[in-house]
């Protein structure tokens, strides 16, 4: 193998190592984003459910007490 090929393989090896490092960082960021989105979604769904419950309860109270 001549010197030029060795140099190219060395550069390719360095680029592949950098690519692997960047892919690992990207994977960690995607996992963090996924956890945050899931937590946010569950939180939002909880608020929606609570709003429906409170609204339904108020309607029921108005009907029960005849306050329309």
UniProtKB/Swiss-Prot annotation:
GO BP: attachment of spindle microtubules to kinetochore; cell division; mitotic sister chromatid biorientation; positive regulation of attachment of spindle microtubules to kinetochore; positive regulation of microtubule polymerization; protein transport along microtubule to mitotic spindle pole body
GO cellular component, one term: spindle
InterPro entries associated with the record: Hsk3, Hsk3-like
Keywords tagged on the record: Cell cycle, Cell division, Centromere, Chromosome, Chromosome partition, Coiled coil, Cytoplasm, Cytoskeleton, Kinetochore, Microtubule, Mitosis, Nucleus
GO MF annotations in UniProt: microtubule plus-end binding
Coiled-coil positions: 3-39
Main location: nucleus
Superkingdom per UniProt: Eukaryota
Places the protein is found: Nucleus; Cytoplasm, Cytoskeleton, Spindle; Chromosome, Centromere, Kinetochore
Pfam families listed in its UniProt record: DASH_Hsk3 (PF08227)
Oligomer status and interactors: Component of the DASH complex consisting of ASK1, DAD1, DAD2, DAD3, DAD4, DAM1, DUO1, HSK3, SPC19 and SPC34, with a stoichiometry of one copy of each subunit per complex. Multiple DASH complexes oligomerize to form a ring that encircles spindle microtubules and organizes the rod-like NDC80 complexes of the outer kinetochore. DASH complex oligomerization strengthens microtubule attachments. On cytoplasmic microtubules, DASH complexes appear to form patches instead of rings.
Sequence similarity: Belongs to the DASH complex HSK3 family.
Protein function: Component of the DASH complex that connects microtubules with kinetochores and couples microtubule depolymerisation to chromosome movement; it is involved in retrieving kinetochores to the spindle poles before their re-orientation on the spindle in early mitosis and allows microtubule depolymerization to pull chromosomes apart and resist detachment during anaphase.
Name listed for the protein in its UniProt record: DASH complex subunit HSK3
Origin species: Eremothecium gossypii (strain ATCC 10895 / CBS 109.51 / FGSC 9923 / NRRL Y-1056)
Gene behind the chain: HSK3
């Amino acid at each position: 193998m001549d010197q030029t090929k060795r140099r190219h393989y060395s550069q390719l090896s360095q680029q592949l190592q950098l690519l692997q490092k960047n892919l690992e960082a990207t994977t960690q960021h995607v996992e963090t984003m996924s956890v945050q989105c899931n937590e946010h979604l569950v939180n939002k769904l909880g608020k929606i459910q609570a709003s429906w419950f409170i609204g339904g309860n108020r309607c029921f109270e108005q009907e029960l007490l005849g306050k329309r």
